[in-house]
From Swiss-Prot:
It comes from the Eukaryota. GO terms for molecular function: glycogen phosphorylase activity; identical protein binding; pyridoxal phosphate binding. It is found in: Plastid, Chloroplast; Plastid, Amyloplast. CDD domains: GT35_Glycogen_Phosphorylase. This is Alpha-1,4 glucan phosphorylase L-1 isozyme, chloroplastic/amyloplastic. The keyword Lipoprotein does not apply.
Length: 966
């Protein structure tokens, strides 16, 4: 391809070889490339021009001036040139070969060239307009592969496919070389990534902030012993997407102490200092120039902290200790926290995310403000969204920066913080509502503990003002449940309310104890605040004086002193202006159960924002056959941005032509999965069987155990029948599981082991053959989901009712025409409403029944179903190997005790579940009916686009406006 300076680079192809002619400025060299793609570099120097980069960096119009890059769209020829350029001059691999890994890196670098134009334009317009910007802080971002998503959003899929074909490669094969970014694990991180996609697509000014984990959570292997965890070094050869910003780094402090200076201010001094360095990843929107940033923090120490003397003295470990301590903060996601060291590391991770991100946000606010910084305008320019409780330390950290570093007083800083920060709750599980050891936090973050104590005291006084002191029992109950600090004495001002007085009388008179009543009109009077926000003196003025000689505090019976804790979820609710659940039923549980006391105090804070998923990744790009059908029958591609157009499929649901196309698309996706399962597990399955899939984090409340018990029951019944009876009573099924159990979650790992043992037995049973297969897919991730979900016939969302906040995989399955079996839990409730009750297989107890059922169990009144007992006995018989499953089955037995009594109601819901599965078989036999149900699931999934969710966040919580990059 000719260039401005006369150099050119082009390819000629023959059936046996590839010929590339490199023309240098002074001489010409020719070389041949065989089919194995071995490069031989010419000895003399040559010039390879990157045509795409030339257009980006030096855009020249015919008139000689700069061109408008907004209309620049690379063609296949310029992309081919760009890929060659990066293969040669952006070296990651040795120069001799142009095999798939190198082709991927060169292609990704070429895509990044295109992204950079829009990325820089987006950054520039945000700087110039200085509009309010949202910042999404999350410990997880489960991005998946970026290549196909990026070129799809840029509308360059065809051009890149042609360019790679010119270079002897297939786009799909090249894309498969990309490792999934190991920055997340489950729904929390995938939701964050879907949100970033929607934010960019909808042109909202926003950034994401996270940590750059070197090894992610772990890579899962399945062995004869079950799950094995190994490090997943997804950055082993680097990432072509990230851009290190060496000029963007911030100091992070741990430990040390707090002292009062001569000016009366509090200073956090000493301790351990590291720095957080920014790595930026571009997030392109679909059919828009807007390209926002995901900024990831990596931790290190300044080079000055390297102990050169110790190193030269042979004390190498000591010399590198500071660097090692800093780097390990970003080694893995969710390090084990059974040990004190693990807890410290997790808290360091959370604080690093919060501190670095807030320093960056504040620096940007100050830069955009110019010479006159008005801190009261900070919430008008900044919205911080905390994705679950992991970023809770944003609240005391923002307070610390504003008070200690920017010179604001307590009231000013608290007003700004509350107007800036908002919190998304993702769980009703008590163990997931984080609590940190007060002692540990005080050691690691002493200044923040002072601020949290002051916030807690503010809260205590607000509770007293709300509820008064007429009913001290009620007040005590509210204080116990609502305080941020758990197992703490009350502030002295409030403790006086609970003092039990004694009246001294004559010796021959009976001593009587009375309570000193404080009327509702009593006032809480405080003096001015110091820089910690603590009250320097607080007292209660009673409406009437009592003639009491002596007051004696009530002393409890001697008991074990419970550990002091910091309740992070309570701090989130107190410190933010909005609290949202992620599904309608979940938000009601949040208001009525989880945070009911706070809802009574601040009802205006609580909202619902039902989750969503991006239709770009989860239909448009992962399921091209279905996408083409949707476009054909709706008459437009607009459904990718306006998913309400999916509803137009409803009127064609019974159309025979559509149904035939629909089934063919599903089958083509299933054929891909057949090959994938054979490659990854060694098991052979047939595409004409029903694909019954449950893929999600392994947890007892998600009830993979209920699913596999149902499969065991099905298998046992099959074994009791003749071959003819089996075919009459059961449709062929391939039951697919996927998901990771946390390394320290023993019971979840037992479930993985059990599933794989059941599969090993059933899959090798010649009597059963293809009538039933059980496959556990190792190392489930986004890329595997993109393969499995389009091929699914039935998906299982069977959590104990009231325990799943929302779920998002259920939305992805529905979008891809998969019919669901599930409980009335999380987003299942809304999905069932949208797709139609008759197109959803419902079973099980409902959320409002759960507490009563657990009490019934505790009272010994529960009678298990005979079929459930039959399954347990069958497992214990050794039908699935010699492994001792007593601990697993024992969790389903008994009426009380930790880890027993079937807390997640597997036994209670089992009969309802297997009867519902019989209805599934019946429906699947009628393929016309099943296909109609499938089409109506896709048509009814329009509500569950993350675009809708983001519009609601932007309007109701963040108060930000979209700005389109021209």
């Amino acid at each position: 391809m000719a260039t401005a300076n006369g150099a050119h680079l082009f390819n000629h192809y023959s059936s046996n070889s590839r010929f590339i002619h490199f023309t240098s400025r002074n001489t010409s060299s020719k070389l041949f490339l065989t089919k194995t793609s071995h490069f031989r570099r010419p000895k003399r120097c040559f010039h390879v021009n990157n045509t795409l980069s030339e257009k980006i960096h030096h855009p020249i119009t015919e008139q000689g001036g700069e061109s408008d890059l907004s209309s620049f769209a690379p063609d296949a020829a310029s992309i081919t040139s760009s890929i060659k350029y990066h293969a040669e001059f952006t070296p990651v691999f040795s120069p001799e070969r142009f095999e798939l890994p190198k082709a991927f890196f060169a292609t990704a670098q070429s895509v990044r060239d295109s992204l950079l134009i829009n990325w820089n334009a987006t950054y520039d317009i945000y700087e110039k307009l200085n509009m309010k910007q949202a910042y999404y802080l999350s410990m997880e971002f489960l991005q998946g592969r970026a290549l196909l998503n990026a070129i799809g959003n840029l509308e360059l899929t065809g051009a890149f496919a042609e360019a790679l074909k010119n270079l002897g490669h297939n786009l799909e094969n090249v894309a498969s070389q990309e490792p999934d970014a190991a920055l997340g694990n489950g729904g929390l991180g995938r939701l964050a990534s879907c949100f970033l996609d929607s934010l960019a697509t909808l042109n909202y000014p926003a950034w994401g902030y996270g940590l750059r984990y070197k090894y992610g959570l772990f890579k899962q292997r399945i062995t004869k012993d079950g799950q094995e965890e190994v490090a997943e070094d997804w950055l082993e050869i680097g990432s072509p997407w990230e851009v290190v910003r060496n000029d963007v780094s911030y100091p992070i402090k741990f430990y040390g102490k707090v002292s009062t200076g001569s000016d009366g201010k509090r200073y956090w001094i000493g301790g351990e200092d590291i720095k957080a360095v920014a790595y930026d990843v571009p997030i392109p929107g679909y059919k828009t120039r807007t390209t926002i940033s995901l900024r990831l923090w990596s931790t290190q120490v300044p080079s000055a902290d390297f102990d050169l003397s110790a190193f030269n003295a042979g004390e190498h470990t000591k010399a590198c200790e500071a660097q090692a301590n800093a780097e390990k903060i970003c080694y893995i996601l969710y390090p084990g926290d059974e040990s004190e060291e693990g807890k410290i590391l997790r808290l360091k991770q959370q604080y690093t995310l919060c501190s670095a991100s807030l320093q960056d946000i504040i620096s940007r606010f100050e830069r955009r403000s110019g010479d006159r910084i008005k801190w009261e305008e900070f919430p008008e320019k900044v919205a911080v969204q905390m994705n679950d409780t992991h970023p809770t330390l944003c609240i005391p950290e923002l307070m610390r920066i504003l008070i200690d570093l920017k010179g604001l007083n307590w009231n000013e800083a608290w007003n700004i913080t509350q107007r800036t920060v908002a919190y998304t709750n993702h769980t009703v599980l008590p163990e997931a509502l984080e609590k940190w050891s007060y002692e540990l936090m005080q050691k690691l973050l002493p200044r923040h503990v002072e601020i949290i104590e002051a916030i807690d005291e503010e809260l205590v006084h607000e509770i007293v003002l709300k509820y008064g002191s007429m009913d001290l029992n009620k007040l005590e109950e509210k204080l116990t449940t609502m305080r941020i600090l758990e197992n703490f004495d009350l502030p002295s001002s409030v403790a006086e309310l609970f003092i039990k007085p004694e009246i001294s009388v004559d010796d021959d008179t009976e001593t009587v104890e009375v309570h000193d009543k404080v009327e509702a009109s009593d006032k809480v009077v405080t003096n001015d605040e110091d820089d910690t926000g603590k009250k320097t003196s607080v007292k209660i003025e009673a409406a009437a004086e009592k003639d009491i000689d002596k007051k004696t505090p009530v002393s409890p019976e001697p008991a074990v002193i419970p550990p002091k804790k910091v309740r992070m979820a309570n701090l989130c609710v107190v410190g933010g202006h909005a609290v949202n659940g992620v599904a309608e039923i979940h938000s009601e549980i949040v208001k009525e159960e989880v945070f009911n006391d706070f809802y009574e105090l601040w009802p205006e804070k609580f909202q619902n924002k039902t989750n969503g998923v991006t239709p770009r990744r989860w239909i448009r790009f992962c399921n091209p056959p279905l996408s083409a059908i949707i476009t054909k029958w709706t008459g437009t591609e607009d459904w990718v941005l306006k998913t309400e157009k999916l509803a137009e499929l409803q009127k064609f649901a019974d159309n025979e032509d559509l149904q035939n196309e629909w089934r063919e698309a599903k089958r083509s996706n299933k054929i891909k999965v057949v090959s994938f399962l054979k490659e990854k597990t060694g098991y052979s399955v047939v595409p004409d069987a029903m694909f019954d899939i449950q893929v999600k984090r392994i947890h007892e409340y998600k009830r993979q155990l209920l699913n596999i018990f149902g499969i065991v029951y099905r298998y046992k019944k099959m074994k009791e029948m003749t071959a003819a009876e089996r075919k009459t009573n059961f449709v062929p099924r391939v039951c697919i599981f996927g998901g990771k159990a946390f390394a320290t979650y023993v019971q979840a790992k037992r479930i993985v082991k059990f599933i794989t043992d059941v599969g090993a037995t059933i899959n090798h049973d010649p009597e059963i053959g293809d009538l039933l297969k059980v496959v556990f897919v190792p190392d489930y991730n986004v890329s595997v989901a993109e393969l499995l979900i389009p091929a699914s016939d039935l998906s299982e969302h069977i959590s104990t009712a009231g325990m799943e906040a929302s779920g998002t995989s259920n939305m992805k399955f529905a979008m891809n025409g998969c019919i669901q079996i599930g409980t009335l839990d999380g987003a299942n409730v809304e999905i069932r409403e949208e797709v139609g009750e008759e197109n959803f297989f419902l079973f099980g107890a409902q959320a409002h029944e759960i507490a009563g059922l657990r009490k019934e169990r505790a009272d010994g009144k529960f009678v298990p179903d005979e079929r459930f007992e039959e399954v347990k006995e069958f497992v214990r018989s050794g039908a699935f190997g010699s492994y001792n499953y007593d601990d697993l089955i024992g969790s389903l037995e008994g009426n009380e005790g930790f880890g027993r009594a079937d807390y997640f109601l597997v036994g209670k819901d089992f009969p309802s579940y297997i009867e519902c599965q019989e209805k599934v078989d019946e429906a699947y036999r009628d393929q016309k009916r099943w296909t109609t149900m499938s089409i109506l699931n896709t048509a009814g999934s329009y509500k569950f686009s993350s675009d809708r969710t983001i519009h609601e966040y932007a309007k109701d919580i963040w108060n930000i406006e979209a700005v389109e990059i021209a």
